[in-house]
Amino acid sequence: MKEVGKMYIIRKAMEYFKPKINRAYMNEVLKRLTENEKKIFLEMSDYDKFHSLEVYKKVRKTDLKNDEKYLKLALLHDCGKGNVSIVTRVLHKLGFKTELQNHAQKSFEKLEKVDEEVAILAKNHHNRGYSEEMGIFQKCDDES
């Protein structure tokens, strides 16, 4: 079982129940996406939209700030999670097997006909050692 700090779990629970999405910022960010990509993003749970916007903010502060595919990945990498409960999310974070284990593959399946390059990145966004760029992305994802 993974070691996860109490404060981390409390923060994530607060974000899950009351995600504070800045709608003006979200609308600005969505201009980067095609209509099909926007549709996928907007179908995500409020928590996953909030998380993705936080990852996007962090990616914008890295060497990937001008890399369109990684900026899109920040917004769409968790689109395969669906609307799962906080209990499932906590169990997954603690290392238990849950339906979230396959979310990267599900994200790939949702994105492959929309943007194959971003779909492949989404499929591999938890694979350590995939690429130097992915390592930068993973740090942003882990911190969000």
Task: Please describe what each predicted stretch is.
Residues M1-K39:
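Non-catalytic interface/linker regions that flank or bridge core catalytic/transmembrane domains
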Residues K38-H51, K57-S144:
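Divalent metal-dependent catalytic cores for phosphoryl transfer on phosphate-bearing substrates
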